[in-house]
From Swiss-Prot:
InterPro entries: Cyclin-like_dom (IPR013763), Cyclin-like_sf (IPR036915), Cyclin/Ssn8 (IPR043198), Cyclin_C_2 (IPR031658), Cyclin_N (IPR006671). Highest levels in pancreas. High levels in heart, liver, skeletal muscle and kidney. Low levels in brain. One of its GO terms (molecular function) is identical protein binding. Residues 252-283 are annotated as: Disordered. Component of the Mediator complex, a coactivator involved in regulated gene transcription of nearly all RNA polymerase II-dependent genes. Mediator functions as a bridge to convey information from gene-specific regulatory proteins to the basal RNA polymerase II transcription machinery. Mediator is recruited to promoters by direct interactions with regulatory proteins and serves as a scaffold for the assembly of a functional preinitiation complex with RNA polymerase II and the general transcription factors. Component of the Mediator complex, which is composed of MED1, MED4, MED6, MED7, MED8, MED9, MED10, MED11, MED12, MED13, MED13L, MED14, MED15, MED16, MED17, MED18, MED19, MED20, MED21, MED22, MED23, MED24, MED25, MED26, MED27, MED29, MED30, MED31, CCNC, CDK8 and CDC2L6/CDK11. The MED12, MED13, CCNC and CDK8 subunits form a distinct module termed the CDK8 module. Mediator containing the CDK8 module is less active than Mediator lacking this module in supporting transcriptional activation. This is Cyclin-C. The gene is CCNC.
Length: 283
């Protein structure tokens, strides 16, 4: 796995520099505080997770969809394409790439409609406004942005190998696995190789379970400073998440979120490259 990763587009093109990521985000931070942007990340990851669970997708498919979502908004403002449209588009594409099988058009739209109505009605009082033609057009922009670099490496496999090597599978794996799932609510998947994220999650799990693994970690030939950077992000996530009341806060945050500009003529909704939808904006 490791050898393949270092030659992959994931490593060569999609491990980003933190300063570049923050620079790209400045357009959105004119409208949102950093904390509100973090909360948006948590929220839309929850939306993708709920969509995936509704469609009975494997966790790896959901994780890949989340990475696609984050990659798009690492390069473009939130106002370029409505995240409410991008979320199911990423799920649709990830289900094909991860060879889960194509989710049918009808099931996808029904799932998005149901999930927003039943799980997130406090944030989205209206019906899911998009149809399959919007999803397919959005998929085109997503593929273009990622330059068809669709294979994503995740921390799950290295985590399993590390826990087996440590000999503490039953004790540590369930908790460490959940922590890996939670890291997708941060930028970590854009900034660090998956094996480092796996080690950081395992380290946190060891601390929580009071497992002394100092000797095991000391024998690794890995940059522990980077592992500690990742751990700090994980702890910050839990601190913010603990104080985040989605039901009370999300409607206000979504109202502040920059949105695609409505077309000058609502009859002929003209988006980028002549697309006929007001959910797209090039600015």
């Amino acid at each position: 796995m490791a050898g393949n990763f270092w030659q992959s587009s994931h490593y060569l093109q999609w491990i980003l520099d933190k300063q570049d990521l923050l620079k790209e985000r400045q357009k959105d931070l004119k409208f949102l505080s950093e904390e509100e942007y973090w909360k948006l990340q948590i929220f839309f990851t929850n939306v993708i997770q709920a969509l995936g669970e509704h469609l009975k997708l494997r966790q790896q498919v959901i994780a890949t969809a989340t990475v696609y979502f984050k990659r798009f908004y690492a390069r473009y403002s939130l106002k370029s394409i409505d995240p409410v449209l991008m979320a199911p588009t990423c799920v649709f594409l990830a289900s094909k790439v991860e060879e889960f099988g194509v989710v049918s058009n009808t099931r996808l739209i029904a799932a998005a409609t149901s999930v927003l109505k039943t799980r997130f009605s406090y944030a989205f009082p209206k019906e899911f406004p998009y149809r399959m033609n919007h999803i397919l057009e959005c998929e085109f922009y997503l593929l273009e942005l990622m330059d068809c670099c669709l294979i994503v490496y995740h921390p799950y496999r290295p985590l399993l190998q590390y826990v087996q090597d440590m000999g503490q599978e039953d004790m540590l794996l369930p908790l460490a696995w959940r922590i890996v799932n939670d890291t997708y609510r941060t930028d970590l998947c854009l900034l660090y190789p998956p094996f480092m994220i796996a080690l950081a999650c395992l380290h946190v799990a060891c601390v929580v379970q009071q497992k002394d693994a100092r000797q095991w970690f000391a024998e690794l030939s890995v940059d522990m400073e980077k592992i500690l950077e990742i751990i700090r992000v994980i702890l910050k996530l839990y601190e913010q998440w603990k104080n985040f009341d989605e039901r009370k806060e999300m409607a206000t945050i979504l109202s502040k979120m920059p949105k695609p500009k409505p077309p000058p003529n609502s009859e002929g909704e003209q988006g980028p490259n002549g697309s006929q939808n007001s959910s797209y904006s090039q600015s």
